């Protein structure tokens, strides 16, 4: 006799992963979509401010979906405030985030394919071997590429590290159950993303999210070829890995100095190291 499992149980089990998939899809659909509208109209129908506002709105929307939409934040949360559930769900959530970003980029391309072809007939990559006569490189619509003035990718890595650290610091504050002064977490994440974009967005396009860059980059490889990975000295490695370290640092700093709740590996380690007089023991 077959056992019937209610559909609601299926949904509840899949919900964390569906939330990450849908949330990240929306993030890229909105974010890369506004970049496409700005770039393909030579910033006539969108500008740097509207690009920042759209990305920030997409991040705030993910809060309502209940998703982190960022593997760096998801991993940092599992490391800094670990639970068995977080670690059990970590692989599935990360895969869902990358898949959502890939599909989101595909939908952006589906919308703007004709406009891309008209604006950049050669389908070129920033820093690639094919030069556009007009100086247009449409691959930058989908993934991030560093500004031409950078002497090395290490300089760009600094920006990505700081941006991801600030983002994780803010996300940790939002997730702090004892942060009574926080009345509107969605607005805080919106404001934080606007601030990061306005202060750090120009030089690296502020990926601060491995899925935001690698998912669309992987899709763009179908259209633009392997140069999306090799361009700019294999720059793709920077937004894929650096935000992870930045997020761990930002979340760790928040918990070390601000967090007063339970379940923080950083706070627990500091409490264990304190002497009876409140000073750090060196014994």
Model-predicted segments: where are they?
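Membrane-interface helix-loop junctions and terminal tails of multi-pass membrane proteins
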Residues: 1-283
């Amino acid at each position: 006799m077959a056992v019937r499992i209610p559909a609601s149980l299926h949904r509840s089990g899949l919900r964390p992963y569906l939330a990450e998939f849908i949330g990240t899809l929306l993030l890229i659909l909105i974010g890369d979509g506004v970049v496409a509208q700005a770039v393909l109209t030579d910033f006539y129908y969108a500008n740097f401010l509207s690009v920042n506002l759209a990305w920030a709105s997409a991040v705030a929307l993910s809060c309502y979906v209940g998703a982190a939409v960022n593997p760096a934040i998801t991993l940092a949360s599992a490391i800094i405030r670990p639970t068995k559930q977080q670690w059990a769900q970590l692989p599935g959530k990360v895969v869902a985030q990358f898949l959502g970003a890939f599909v989101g980029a595909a939908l952006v391309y589906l919308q703007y394919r004709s406009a891309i072809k008209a604006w950049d007939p050669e389908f070129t990559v920033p820093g690639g071997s094919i030069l556009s006569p007009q100086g247009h490189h449409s691959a930058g619509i989908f993934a991030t590429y560093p500004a031409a003035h950078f002497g090395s990718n290490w300089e760009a890595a600094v920006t990505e590290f700081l941006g991801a650290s600030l983002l994780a610091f803010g996300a940790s504050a939002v997730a702090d159950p004892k942060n009574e002064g926080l009345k509107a977490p969605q607005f805080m994440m919106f404001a934080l993303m606007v601030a990061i974009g306005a202060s750090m967005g120009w030089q690296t396009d502020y990926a601060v999210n491995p899925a935001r860059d690698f998912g669309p980059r992987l899709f763009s490889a179908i259209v633009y070829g392997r140069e999306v990975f090799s361009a700019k000295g294999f720059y793709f490695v920077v937004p894929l890995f650096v935000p992870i370290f930045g997020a761990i640092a930002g979340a760790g700093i928040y918990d070390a100095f601000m967090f007063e709740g339970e379940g923080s590996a950083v706070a627990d380690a500091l409490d264990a190291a304190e002497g009876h007089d409140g000073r750090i023991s060196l014994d």
